[in-house]
Amino acid sequence: DWVCEMQHVILGAGPAGVAAAYDLSLLGHDVVICEREERPGGMLRYGIPAFRLPRNILDVELHNALRLGVQLRTGVEIGNGEGQVPMSKLESEFDAVLLATGCMAASPLPLRGEWETRDLRGIEGVEYGLDFLMQMHRGVAKTVGKRVAVVGAGFTALDCARVAARLGAAEVTIHIRTAEEYIPVTQEEIFEAKREGVRIKG
């Protein structure tokens, strides 16, 4: 087998970063993963609720992927600010730098008219779904109102609705633009959400 030993640093310990580290380790390379968060997993840990992806299962899978000698450094932020690690330092210390920083950014809602250019984060009581879920998983205490409206039709929308119900919202409604049968999630997810009191309105 052809093996070329190199020292790699991977930025991001999400699914892509961990998978790359595993494959590179199998090829005989030395691998270091730098992760901004305190624990690895990326979107799997910080964007998916534990009731949908149990953390013990996630931790076992991550352990199996990283057990080949991969070094994991958490709490590392790349940049030129105070306490950050400059990219130039990584480029000088390693043979290759792999960017696997993930998709942990909320997608803006496509609104028209006066709302088109407005940042919804500045409105009291309005949050982007991914921001809401990540804050929950980082241990930021959240409160919700008695009535919660979720706009969207994917897994993130259902996760937010189910989390809001668990936080004590008396009424949680998911508002969608299409018919329920076209929602891009599994029927099991829809069943579980409804069983927990979530309503879906098209």
State the predicted function of each range.
Residues 1-7, 60, 123-129:
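Extreme N-terminal leader/targeting segments of oxidoreductases
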Residues 9-34, 73-93, 105-109, 129-187:
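Rossmann-like dinucleotide/flavin-binding elements
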Residues 27-28, 50, 114-118, 167:
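Glycine-rich, phosphate-binding/catalytic loops in enzymes
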Residues 33, 37-68, 161-202:
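Rossmann-like dinucleotide-binding cores of NAD(P)H-dependent redox enzymes
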Residues 69, 94-95:
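Residue-level detector of structured alpha->beta connecting loops
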Residues 70-74, 126, 200:
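Generic structural signal for residues in well-ordered beta-strands
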Residues 98:
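N-terminal Rossmann-like NAD(P) cofactor-binding module of classical short-chain dehydrogenase/reductase
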Residues 101-121, 126:
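Flavin (primarily FAD) binding-site architecture
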